Curated annotation (Swiss-Prot):
Residues 217-225 are annotated as: PPIA/CYPA-binding loop. SMART domains: ZnF_C2HC. GO terms for molecular function: RNA binding; structural molecule activity; zinc ion binding. This is Gag polyprotein. A motif (Nuclear localization signal) lies at residues 26-32. The gene is gag. A motif (LYPX(n)L motif) lies at residues 483-492. The modification Asymmetric dimethylarginine is found at residues 387, 409. Keywords: AIDS, Capsid protein, Host cell membrane, Host cytoplasm, Host endosome, Host membrane, Host nucleus, Host-virus interaction, Lipoprotein, Membrane, Metal-binding, Methylation, Myristate, Phosphoprotein, Repeat, RNA-binding, Viral budding, Viral budding via the host ESCRT complexes, Viral nucleoprotein, Viral release from host cell, Virion, Zinc, Zinc-finger. It holds the Pfam family zf-CCHC. SUPFAM superfamilies: Retroviral matrix proteins (SSF47836), Retrovirus capsid dimerization domain-like (SSF47353), Retrovirus capsid protein, N-terminal core domain (SSF47943), Retrovirus zinc finger-like domains (SSF57756).
Amino acid sequence: MGARASVLSAGELDKWEKIRLRPGGKKQYRLKHIVWASRELERFAVDPGLLETSEGCRQILGQLQPSLQTGSEELRSLYNTVATLYCVHQKIEVKDTKEALEKIEEEQNKSKKKAQQAAADTGNSSQVSQNYPIVQNLQGQMVHQAISPRTLNAWVKVVEEKAFSPEVIPMFSALSEGATPQDLNTMLNTVGGHQAAMQMLKETINEEAAEWDRLHPVHAGPIAPGQMREPRGSDIAGTTSTLQEQIGWMTNNPPIPVGEIYKRWIILGLNKIVRMYSPTSILDIRQGPKEPFRDYVDRFYKTLRAEQASQEVKNWMTETLLVQNANPDCKTILKALGPAATLEEMMTACQGVGGPGHKARVLAEAMSQVTNSATIMMQRGNFRNQRKTVKCFNCGKEGHIAKNCRAPRKKGCWKCGKEGHQMKDCTERQANFLGKIWPSHKGRPGNFLQSRPEPTAPSEESVRFGEETTTPSQKQEPIDKELYPLASLRSLFGSDPSSQ
């Protein structure tokens, strides 16, 4: 990071950090943006050291500008960052990124006018391309520089690591900037695997070549001296044309950009391959119940890049489906933000949803609702399991226990009042299973009837039959005594009720 931090001097760094990212926005450029730009340039096989000078930034802008129409958001952000850095190097006062882009556009228009004026003064109106890999040597001839092994290695590495994910297309566009059809075929031939995808790409190229031949028929008659023949579809694809013919078409006046045409065909085929390798539709991307909102947004935009739709349709998908397919927790938060909320505000609001803190808050809210409902039931008298009031053994008052009693501690046993033992060891008046003190010297145990009440009115039998009913009962008692002489209960439970 130290080397990347040396891109700007102290004074230039102060100016850099005063420039805003957007007009009227609060965020400003920081050192991390330069670090990110240098890493992106390394990923695109471009020397990050070019950022240290204004001329290097101008070269980077010249390579990135043709890809802005078909490039990704990362490519546009890289272009904007380098453009702003160029203004800082050139000591051009700008307030935000938009103003820096306007300054770059003005400077490019001025340079074009100067070049046209110089060509008119010298009598040479031919606008010769100076773009890499076609350069002009010291003799003024246009020569071709073969694509470097480093570029090929970067392309093969991307295909091996990413297969045919959506980010492969902007990577191919950046690596093939200014390339001839022969260079593009070299890049395609270095792909060893994924032959099914390569076959699909060949079919797309053949279809586009046939469409080119249909729209651009060959003019009848001989070719004028000094003029080149018109390229056919197979010539643009590099199968029936030589390298010198390709350079001639690209540097002719007016030029025929066979390299850019062939590149568009390849990108069209790559889009079909990306759609095949990413079968998931944007409509199927939904946030899981425990998935962080950040991971859901990453999956959403990755699938959105593979969708073959216009930018207006993609904007509608983002505004509608991103909120609609979120989980209930995030959807509630996003709807509360309103339709004009930015992605940064959405991610900040849903940052903790699904994590332990959010779960704890939801659980606390649920518990508070349950507690409130229980309180309402108790107030209405529907709560039956009311706790019994406790009573203190020390002071005899209710509402607290002896452990929390503030009264002076009573000495001795709390049950019998004697000293020398505690209540748990007290043997005074220990109750048996019948609920009374045992042994008892007062007759029968407590669960027996102590006295039988005598009836105050004669029974129904005595009223009906008179003395006939009373005589057998009087005779039955001595018979029972004679048959069961040992049946007295006195020996077991004290006084026998039959002997009373």
